[in-house]
Amino acid sequence: MNSADTLSNLAALLLSGKVEVVDLSGRLGPDTPLLKLPPDFARDTPKIELHKISEYDSDGPFWAWNWLKVGEHSGTHFDAPHHWITGKDYADGYTDSIPVQNFVAPVNVIDCSAETAKNPDFLLDAAGVQAWEAKHGEIRKGEWVVMRTDWDSRVNDEAAYLNADATGPHSPGPTVDCIKYILSKGAIGWGTQCIGTDAGQAGGMEPPYPAHNLLHAANKYGLASLANLSKLPAKGAILIAAPLKIVSGTGSPIRAMALVPRG
């Protein structure tokens, strides 16, 4: 079978419903939770604004459209290497210079939802990834690795989604050795269902924020605020995560989706 036959078969499977397209993005609007940074550290992304230009009225009698004010790292979004200082020198580290081939890849879904239901500060380590591989198969070069936590169930309550107290945010994520391990396997990137790709308490790790620090140092990518990972198999799905082609963009909101076999 050649590549043309393969694509033709995929089209038939999509039309028949034997391959399902699963939406992995949350809604994007004024109520979308956004990351809160320490006031003495950096400025926050402003809240998302949606403004009507016209809707079949005197400003536009036959059409409706809006303008949108939104930060690059808002809602379900893509982190490009230039987002972090360790990835600042890559010519192809921006949303308008990343090879488009990298936006479509197989995805490995590591289910940590039982652990995170009991412990919001749960950390996935390299041993946990290796145990998952022993059960489901190896992570291969060029594939995504995503951490299922079902944290998206909190997204309609910003306080619960950020889950912060006087000691900072409390949300699950990877350890340093987890990120080092998936990079050693050749993963193209790492994704989570939380506000960012790192755990809430990752600032205290060495190096701090390892998902950001190490992934982008290796010219790899991050996905945050993913939804519906419970609808994906551990292996076998194809992830599509294409950022807007923002000039010199460090990231972008995305409509992430997955192709999932159903029959």
State the predicted function of each range.
Residues 1-263:
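Active-/binding-site microenvironments in catalytic and ligand-binding cores
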